[in-house]
């Protein structure tokens, strides 16, 4: 498990440390918890795909329960949550984590919002080549809130289409799984972006942070692409 560290300076009220964990897809919870504890975060942020499907969700639920015992834990809804036959939001809420289903809350002076995957309207996930749109009305309303705003948004491909022109300070995403196979610093494929995707890992335009994620939803292995969690430190700018 790789811990990737990013440090940004911005208009936060105080320095804050977030552990960012994405795309669990049934990955065993113990190594993820150990890595989270190593980062000593103020809170844990999970931008979707805690659950894989009806047959593979228990490890993700266990991780959420353990995280919520030790840290404030905030979760948004990814596309795989909608592969559950039961209500995924209710299931996630039972863990004690704060589930942000097109909602926001405040933590340490930071407004944390969760933009739900557009697959809520396409639960069979027939849009293989493109991603259904999110709730743009909620997104617009969130962007108008005063203060420093962090958006948990599972799909990085939403950024150019719906988010780039919004007044949102930081966007945290996953979904691309680092491009699955990585060669010469580039990923090969990402769902919703296709071959040679633009957004696979790292920081883009100074405000879109994309995690490689932890698990693997495909039968194809990850190559040159270790599971990662991110330690994101946001430091208060000096005036």
Predicted regions mapped to residue ranges:
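Short extracytoplasmic
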Residues: 13-39
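Binuclear metal-dependent hydrolase catalytic cores centered on His/Asp/Glu-rich metal-binding motifs
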Residues: 90-95, 108-150, 159-161, 221-223
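Acidic/histidine-rich helix-loop elements
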Residues: 17-26, 50-58, 83-86, 120-130, ...
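Core catalytic region of metal-dependent phosphoesterases/phosphodiesterases
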Residues: 29-108
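Conserved beta-sheet core of the metallophosphoesterase superfamily
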Residues: 156-233
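Active-site neighborhood of phospho(di)ester-bond hydrolases with catalytic His/Asp-centered motifs
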Residues: 20-22, 43-49, 72-79, 100-102, ...
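N-terminal membrane-anchoring alpha-helices
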Residues: 1-14
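Active-site-proximal beta-strand elements of phosphoester/diester hydrolases
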Residues: 15-25, 109-119, 150-154, 207-213
């Amino acid at each position: 498990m790789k811990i990737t560290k990013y440090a940004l300076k911005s208009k936060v009220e105080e320095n804050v440390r977030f552990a960012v964990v994405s795309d669990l897809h049934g990955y065993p919870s113990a190594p993820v918890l150990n890595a989270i504890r190593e980062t000593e975060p103020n809170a844990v942020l999970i931008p979707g795909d805690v659950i894989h499907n009806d047959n593979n969700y228990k490890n993700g639920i266990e991780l959420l329960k353990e995280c919520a015992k030790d840290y404030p834990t905030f979760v948004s809804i990814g596309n795989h949550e909608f592969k559950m036959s039961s209500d995924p939001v209710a299931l996630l809420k039972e863990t004690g984590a704060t589930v942000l289903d097109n909602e926001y809350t405040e933590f340490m002076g930071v407004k944390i919002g969760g933009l739900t995957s557009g697959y809520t309207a396409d639960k069979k996930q027939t849009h293989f080549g493109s991603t259904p749109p999110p709730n743009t009305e909620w997104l617009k309303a969130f962007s108008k809130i005063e203060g420093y705003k962090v958006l948990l948004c599972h799909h990085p491909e939403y950024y150019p289409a719906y988010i780039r022109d919004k007044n949102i300070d930081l966007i945290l995403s996953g979904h691309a799984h680092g491009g699955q196979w990585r060669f010469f610093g580039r990923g090969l494929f990402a769902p919703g972006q296709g071959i040679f995707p633009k957004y696979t890992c790292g920081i883009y335009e100074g405000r879109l942070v994309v995690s490689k994620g932890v698990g693997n939803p495909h039968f194809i292995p990850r190559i040159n692409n270790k599971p990662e969690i991110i330690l994101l430190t946001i430091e208060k700018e000096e005036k």
